[in-house]
Amino acid sequence: MKKTLYFAGGCFWGTEHFFKGIDGVTETTPGYANGNLDNPSYEQVYTDTTGHAETVKVVYDPAWVSAARLVKLFFASIDPLSLNRQGHDVGTRYRTGVFYDDPSDLPAIRSEFEAASLRLGADPVTELQPLKGFWSAEERHRDYLDKNPGGYCHLPLKAFKYLRLYQDLGLLLGDEEDPTARQAQTAALITERMKFLWTGFYRVIGDTLVLGPFQGSPACFRIKRGRGVCGTAWERKNTVVVPDVEQFPGHIACSSLSRSEIVVPVIRGEEVTAVLDIDSTSLGTFDETDAVWLEMICDLL
């Protein structure tokens, strides 16, 4: 039996395209939700006077994907702390929200809102409301990015690559229990899909990070806690994004080709068990999009 949720994520062109890429989603429809006018037109909604949010109706198979997983992935596609703005789009019609028509979904949805609050250190401004009305958008807005591959999209292209990577990695890891094997497959798949200079793990052993599975050129064997980018991420228990490695105090240069770097801690319970280290040959490669998705990938481990 199919179920339905409604997601307001900014411009519905990009939001619909994002949800179409989620395994278990069977149908998507862009439209206008939770306003004060029946059957509005795009031109009316655009005035920001009707109260509607650009929204995507998502029909999904709960045997394949859960409401909680849809909300988790949705949060990875938006800036949940931005009020009435996503990307370059500004106005109440671009506010973010999750609208439900089945109250039994509410506990699972709320749990993902709480998880987002913990990760962000603040409550999302994303609305969580029952659906009060939804009207499909005009035909020209449906499947917009399929019809116009070069059309405007407020989401970065790498968000779609990470979405596919995240889903495929979950299937690849399956029920394998060995952490080293899981790290090895993760490093391999990230390298295959994202083409970074170096991708690998350092494992926490005592007071030292010790080199684990990786893809790339030979690297440092050991890094002390608090040293370099990897040791700093371990000590802080937070992701560290470095736009220019030459500007990071105490940077440990394992490769002269590395220009920017991101390090994500792998946390179990309250303890860091490893860090995921990724380097790029270009300056400023990594940003909040990379951080959000790579943190979700580390949660799979």
What are these model-predicted stretches?
Residues 1-165:
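Flexible coil/turn and secondary-structure edge motifs
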Residues 22, 141, 193, 242, ...:
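Acidic-histidine catalytic/liganding microenvironments
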Residues 260-267:
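A short, aliphatic-rich beta-strand micro-motif
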Residues 170, 280-301:
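Juxtadomain coupling helices with adjacent low-complexity linkers
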Residues 274-275:
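Short glycine-/small-residue motifs
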Residues 164-221, 296, 300-301:
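Intrinsically disordered, low-complexity terminal regulatory regions
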Residues 204-256:
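Regulatory sensory and allosteric helical modules in signal-transduction proteins
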